[in-house]
Protein backbone atom coordinates (compact mmCIF):
# COMPACT_ATOMS: atom_id res chain seq x y z
CA UNK A 1 0.00 0.00 0.00
CA UNK A 2 1.52 3.26 -0.91
CA UNK A 3 0.97 5.41 2.14
CA UNK A 4 -2.26 7.17 2.61
CA UNK A 5 -0.91 10.66 3.20
CA UNK A 6 -2.75 12.46 5.74
CA UNK A 7 -3.58 15.18 8.10
CA UNK A 8 -6.14 17.50 9.64
CA UNK A 9 -9.07 17.80 12.26
CA UNK A 10 -11.28 20.37 14.09
CA UNK A 11 -12.18 21.50 17.58
CA UNK A 12 -15.67 21.94 19.02
CA UNK A 13 -16.49 24.20 21.95
CA UNK A 14 -19.03 23.36 24.63
CA UNK A 15 -20.68 25.97 26.80
CA UNK A 16 -21.64 25.16 30.35
CA UNK A 17 -24.71 26.22 32.29
CA UNK A 18 -25.33 26.19 36.00
CA UNK A 19 -27.37 23.08 36.71
CA UNK A 20 -27.68 20.14 39.04
CA UNK A 21 -24.50 18.14 39.69
CA UNK A 22 -25.59 15.34 37.36
CA UNK A 23 -25.95 17.79 34.49
CA UNK A 24 -22.50 19.23 35.22
CA UNK A 25 -20.92 15.78 35.09
CA UNK A 26 -22.64 15.07 31.79
CA UNK A 27 -21.35 18.34 30.34
CA UNK A 28 -17.76 17.51 31.30
CA UNK A 29 -18.04 14.04 29.78
CA UNK A 30 -19.30 15.45 26.50
CA UNK A 31 -16.54 18.04 26.42
CA UNK A 32 -13.83 15.45 26.89
CA UNK A 33 -15.04 13.20 24.07
CA UNK A 34 -15.64 14.89 20.73
CA UNK A 35 -16.45 13.30 17.40
CA UNK A 36 -14.87 15.63 14.89
CA UNK A 37 -14.61 16.45 11.22
CA UNK A 38 -11.29 16.28 9.33
CA UNK A 39 -8.74 18.84 10.46
CA UNK A 40 -5.95 19.49 12.95
CA UNK A 41 -5.91 21.10 16.37
CA UNK A 42 -5.39 20.55 20.06
CA UNK A 43 -7.50 18.48 22.43
CA UNK A 44 -6.93 17.96 26.15
CA UNK A 45 -3.25 18.88 25.91
CA UNK A 46 -2.42 16.91 22.74
CA UNK A 47 -2.13 17.80 19.08
CA UNK A 48 -4.42 15.80 16.83
CA UNK A 49 -4.70 15.27 13.11
CA UNK A 50 -7.52 13.60 11.22
CA UNK A 51 -7.82 13.39 7.44
CA UNK A 52 -9.92 11.37 5.03
CA UNK A 53 -10.35 11.32 1.28
CA UNK A 54 -14.07 12.05 1.39
CA UNK A 55 -15.36 8.50 0.99
CA UNK A 56 -16.97 8.54 4.42
CA UNK A 57 -17.55 5.54 6.63
CA UNK A 58 -15.13 6.80 9.30
CA UNK A 59 -15.86 8.14 12.78
CA UNK A 60 -12.88 9.71 14.55
CA UNK A 61 -13.35 10.73 18.19
CA UNK A 62 -11.03 12.60 20.55
CA UNK A 63 -11.24 11.37 24.13
CA UNK A 64 -9.74 12.55 27.44
CA UNK A 65 -6.01 13.21 27.59
CA UNK A 66 -4.14 11.36 24.87
CA UNK A 67 -7.00 9.01 24.04
CA UNK A 68 -8.66 8.77 20.63
CA UNK A 69 -10.80 6.21 18.86
CA UNK A 70 -11.61 5.37 15.26
CA UNK A 71 -14.38 3.22 13.84
CA UNK A 72 -14.50 2.62 10.12
CA UNK A 73 -16.52 0.53 7.70
CA UNK A 74 -16.20 0.41 3.91
CA UNK A 75 -14.02 3.48 4.22
CA UNK A 76 -11.77 5.08 1.67
CA UNK A 77 -8.39 6.38 2.75
CA UNK A 78 -8.08 7.99 6.21
CA UNK A 79 -5.56 8.65 8.96
CA UNK A 80 -6.06 10.06 12.45
CA UNK A 81 -4.38 10.21 15.80
CA UNK A 82 -2.89 12.22 18.66
CA UNK A 83 0.59 13.37 19.60
CA UNK A 84 2.72 16.50 19.46
CA UNK A 85 3.38 19.54 17.29
CA UNK A 86 6.24 19.73 16.71
CA UNK A 87 7.62 16.29 17.39
CA UNK A 88 11.19 15.60 18.46
CA UNK A 89 13.97 13.26 17.36
CA UNK A 90 14.43 11.65 20.78
CA UNK A 91 10.95 11.17 22.21
CA UNK A 92 9.94 7.91 23.88
CA UNK A 93 6.28 7.49 22.93
CA UNK A 94 3.98 5.31 25.00
CA UNK A 95 0.78 3.92 23.53
CA UNK A 96 -1.83 1.42 24.68
CA UNK A 97 -5.27 0.21 23.70
CA UNK A 98 -7.03 -1.97 21.18
CA UNK A 99 -6.56 -2.18 17.42
CA UNK A 100 -8.85 -4.43 15.37
CA UNK A 101 -8.44 -3.94 11.62
CA UNK A 102 -10.25 -5.94 8.98
CA UNK A 103 -8.28 -5.34 5.82
CA UNK A 104 -5.69 -2.76 4.89
CA UNK A 105 -4.65 -0.63 7.88
CA UNK A 106 -1.65 0.52 9.96
CA UNK A 107 -1.03 1.46 13.59
CA UNK A 108 2.15 3.53 13.70
CA UNK A 109 4.14 6.42 15.02
CA UNK A 110 3.63 8.79 12.13
CA UNK A 111 4.94 12.22 11.24
CA UNK A 112 6.62 14.65 8.90
CA UNK A 113 9.78 16.72 8.64
CA UNK A 114 10.51 19.77 6.52
CA UNK A 115 13.69 20.59 4.59
CA UNK A 116 13.81 17.86 3.48
CA UNK A 117 10.12 17.06 3.23
CA UNK A 118 9.83 13.53 4.63
CA UNK A 119 6.83 11.44 5.64
CA UNK A 120 7.77 8.71 8.12
CA UNK A 121 6.26 5.65 9.75
CA UNK A 122 7.32 3.44 12.64
CA UNK A 123 4.76 0.69 12.06
CA UNK A 124 3.80 -1.23 15.18
CA UNK A 125 0.91 -3.24 13.76
CA UNK A 126 -0.94 -3.66 10.49
CA UNK A 127 -3.84 -5.53 8.95
CA UNK A 128 -3.78 -7.72 5.85
CA UNK A 129 -1.22 -5.70 3.87
CA UNK A 130 2.44 -5.39 4.81
CA UNK A 131 3.53 -1.84 3.93
CA UNK A 132 6.97 -3.08 2.92
CA UNK A 133 5.53 -5.09 0.01
CA UNK A 134 7.46 -4.25 -3.14
CA UNK A 135 9.97 -2.02 -1.35
CA UNK A 136 13.73 -2.63 -1.13
CA UNK A 137 14.96 -3.36 2.38
CA UNK A 138 17.81 -1.05 3.41
CA UNK A 139 18.59 -2.44 6.84
CA UNK A 140 17.12 -3.27 10.20
CA UNK A 141 17.11 -2.02 13.77
CA UNK A 142 16.37 -3.81 17.03
CA UNK A 143 14.38 -1.68 19.45
CA UNK A 144 11.72 -2.10 22.11
CA UNK A 145 11.70 -5.89 21.97
CA UNK A 146 11.61 -6.52 18.23
CA UNK A 147 13.48 -6.25 14.97
CA UNK A 148 12.19 -3.58 12.59
CA UNK A 149 12.94 -3.66 8.86
CA UNK A 150 13.91 -0.34 7.28
CA UNK A 151 12.67 0.85 3.88
CA UNK A 152 12.47 3.99 1.78
CA UNK A 153 9.78 4.70 -0.80
CA UNK A 154 8.93 7.75 -2.90
CA UNK A 155 5.66 9.55 -3.52
CA UNK A 156 5.33 11.62 -6.68
CA UNK A 157 2.91 14.56 -6.89
CA UNK A 158 0.97 13.47 -3.82
CA UNK A 159 -0.68 15.37 -0.94
CA UNK A 160 1.66 16.52 1.83
CA UNK A 161 1.86 19.05 4.64
CA UNK A 162 2.93 21.68 2.10
CA UNK A 163 0.42 20.73 -0.60
CA UNK A 164 1.00 18.49 -3.61
CA UNK A 165 4.67 17.50 -3.71
CA UNK A 166 7.19 14.75 -4.44
CA UNK A 167 8.87 13.37 -1.32
CA UNK A 168 10.40 10.31 0.29
CA UNK A 169 8.83 8.11 2.93
CA UNK A 170 10.95 6.41 5.60
CA UNK A 171 9.70 3.19 7.19
CA UNK A 172 10.50 0.99 10.16
CA UNK A 173 8.17 -2.04 10.13
CA UNK A 174 8.00 -4.12 13.30
CA UNK A 175 8.16 -7.89 12.88
CA UNK A 176 6.38 -8.72 16.14
CA UNK A 177 3.08 -6.87 15.98
CA UNK A 178 1.67 -5.14 19.05
CA UNK A 179 -1.01 -2.64 20.02
CA UNK A 180 0.58 -1.36 23.24
CA UNK A 181 4.12 -0.47 24.27
CA UNK A 182 6.83 2.19 24.05
CA UNK A 183 8.65 3.45 20.97
CA UNK A 184 12.11 4.98 21.35
CA UNK A 185 12.07 7.16 18.25
CA UNK A 186 15.79 8.01 18.49
CA UNK A 187 16.70 4.38 17.83
CA UNK A 188 14.83 4.48 14.53
CA UNK A 189 15.98 7.92 13.44
CA UNK A 190 19.62 7.03 14.17
CA UNK A 191 19.30 3.75 12.27
CA UNK A 192 17.74 5.59 9.34
CA UNK A 193 20.58 8.13 9.34
CA UNK A 194 23.09 5.28 9.08
CA UNK A 195 21.34 4.34 5.83
CA UNK A 196 21.50 7.93 4.57
CA UNK A 197 17.86 8.63 5.46
CA UNK A 198 18.03 12.02 7.14
CA UNK A 199 15.19 14.03 8.63
CA UNK A 200 14.81 17.79 8.57
CA UNK A 201 13.01 20.12 10.95
CA UNK A 202 10.37 18.14 12.77
CA UNK A 203 6.71 18.87 12.08
CA UNK A 204 3.94 16.98 13.87
CA UNK A 205 4.45 13.52 15.38
CA UNK A 206 1.48 11.35 16.34
CA UNK A 207 0.40 7.80 17.01
CA UNK A 208 -1.97 7.20 14.12
CA UNK A 209 -4.47 4.69 12.83
CA UNK A 210 -4.63 4.61 9.06
CA UNK A 211 -6.98 2.68 6.82
CA UNK A 212 -7.47 2.10 3.12
CA UNK A 213 -10.78 0.71 1.81
CA UNK A 214 -11.18 -1.49 4.86
CA UNK A 215 -13.07 -1.66 8.14
CA UNK A 216 -12.24 -1.97 11.82
CA UNK A 217 -12.03 -0.24 15.16
CA UNK A 218 -9.32 1.15 17.40
CA UNK A 219 -9.08 2.91 20.76
CA UNK A 220 -5.59 4.18 21.57
CA UNK A 221 -4.11 6.30 24.36
CA UNK A 222 -0.76 8.04 23.85
CA UNK A 223 1.60 9.72 26.30
From Swiss-Prot:
It is found in: Secreted. It comes from Hypocrea jecorina (strain ATCC 56765 / BCRC 32924 / NRRL 11460 / Rut C-30). It is an enzyme of class 3 (hydrolase). Residues 34-222 form the GH11 domain. Glycoside hydrolase involved in the hydrolysis of xylan, a major plant cell wall hemicellulose made up of 1,4-beta-linked D-xylopyranose residues. Catalyzes the endohydrolysis of the main-chain 1,4-beta-glycosidic bonds connecting the xylose subunits yielding various xylooligosaccharides and xylose. The catalysis proceeds by a double-displacement reaction mechanism with a putative covalent glycosyl-enzyme intermediate, with retention of the anomeric configuration. Produces xylobiose and xylose as the main degradation products. Keywords: Carbohydrate metabolism, Glycoprotein, Glycosidase, Hydrolase, Polysaccharide degradation, Pyrrolidone carboxylic acid, Secreted, Signal, Xylan degradation. Belongs to the glycosyl hydrolase 11 (cellulase G) family. Residues 20-33 form a propeptide. One of its GO terms (cellular component) is extracellular region. Substrate binds at residues 106, 110, 121, 155, 159, 169, 204. Induction: Induced by D-xylose, dependent on the cellulase and xylanase regulator xyr1. Repressed by glucose through negative regulation by the crabon catabolite repressor cre1. Its main location: secreted. GO terms for molecular function: endo-1,4-beta-xylanase activity. The gene is xyn2. The keyword Repeat does not apply. It comes from the Eukaryota. This is Endo-1,4-beta-xylanase 2. The modification Pyrrolidone carboxylic acid is found at residue 34. The keyword Metal-binding does not apply. SUPFAM superfamilies: Concanavalin A-like lectins/glucanases (SSF49899). Glycans are attached at residues 71, 94. Residues 1-19 form the signal peptide.
